[in-house]
């Protein structure tokens, strides 16, 4: 079962989107695999202290994108393959890098400064 033990809500971002992104990031990083079971909507809402409709909204979006298979009254499972995981990873990275580039340009940083900082932090933040 997918664990939400390290889920940390951020202020200013709707919780349903944070749940969606948490699952997408887990899939992109390989922590969430094809066939992994998601907690029930009721269990996850109690765990996170949010309204069950919030969890339902996140799960519905995951179902609409084909990442989750659910049946009424049954468990929900991840539906992932290599191509899907690559697409998720690409989408997440593009979104994050786009926000970073926008912020750097707004502070007046040039491309060379940005790339230099990226190289420095890449080495420092080795995971």
Stretches found by the model and what they are:
Residues 79-98:
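A surface-exposed regulatory interaction patch that couples sensing to output
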Residues 37-38, 70-78, 82-83:
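Short, Lys/Arg-rich nucleic-acid/phosphate-binding segment
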Residues 1-37, 43, 91, 95, ...:
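Extreme N-terminal segment that seeds HTH/winged-HTH DNA-binding domains in transcriptional regulators
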Residues 37-48, 62:
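A short alpha-helical element within helix-turn-helix/winged-helix DNA-binding domains
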Residues 23, 59-60:
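Short, hydrophobic-biased segments on the C-terminal half of alpha helices
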């Amino acid at each position: 079962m997918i664990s939400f033990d390290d889920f940390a809500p951020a202020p200013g971002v709707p919780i349903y989107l944070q749940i969606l992104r948490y699952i997408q990031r887990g899939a992109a990083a390989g922590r969430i695999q094809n066939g992994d079971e998601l907690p029930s909507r009721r269990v996850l809402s109690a765990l996170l202290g949010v309204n069950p409709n919030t969890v339902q909204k996140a799960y519905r979006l995951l179902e609409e994108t084909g990442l989750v298979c659910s049946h009424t009254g049954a468990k929900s499972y991840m539906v992932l393959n290599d191509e899907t995981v690559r697409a998720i990873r690409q989408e997440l990275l593009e979104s994050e890098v786009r926000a970073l580039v926008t912020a750097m340009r707004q502070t007046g940083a040039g491309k060379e400064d940005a790339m230099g900082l990226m190289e420095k932090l890449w080495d420092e933040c080795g995971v």
